[in-house]
Amino acid sequence: VVEPGESFTFTFDDETSNNGVFTRSVNAGACTGTFAAPQVEAGRIISYGLHVRCTGTGFLPLSAKIRLQEEHFGFFYETVDETFKSLTEGGYGFVRGEAICGPTTSGHDYRISGEIFAGSHHGFGISREVHLPCNVN
């Protein structure tokens, strides 16, 4: 079970080959994703994002996927927007998503689902919910 939070971190080993001999470096790298909580901006746009930072070795190529999820009935989450980005800056980058904030009388709770793809490694996290006066269609 993944607990909601402000960020998530995962560590990984790295395998290298030298003259056909494979060696494994334990805890060779780590990646952290820090959520930029959904918020309503000018023009009724919901913006949301994920800051990614990786250290060590074995995390290239690096990319991330974020999903804006709208809560329904207190337990079901519908993905209403999704963004994927290759991060070419090295061990860091930012993925930003945007969705239209449609009118509603009561609003909805939103969260971000984030995934980091670091070489052959993968990490996942979810943000805490925020209530916004929106309905994303």
Stretches found by the model and what they are:
Residues G90-P103:
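Exposed aromatic-hydrophobic patches
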Residues G102-R128:
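Internal, hydrophobic beta-strand segments that form the core of beta-sheet-rich folds
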Residues T88, S120-N137:
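Short beta-strand elements
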Residues E78-Y92:
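Solvent-exposed serine/threonine-rich low-complexity stretches and specific carbohydrate-binding patches
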Residues Q39-R53:
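Contiguous beta-strand segments within globular domains
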Residues V1-E41:
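N-terminal prepro-regions of secreted/extracellular proteins
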Residues A64-H72:
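Conserved aromatic beta-strand anchor motif in extracellular beta-sandwich/beta-rich domains
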Residues C54-L62:
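A short beta-turn/strand-edge loop motif at beta-sheet boundaries
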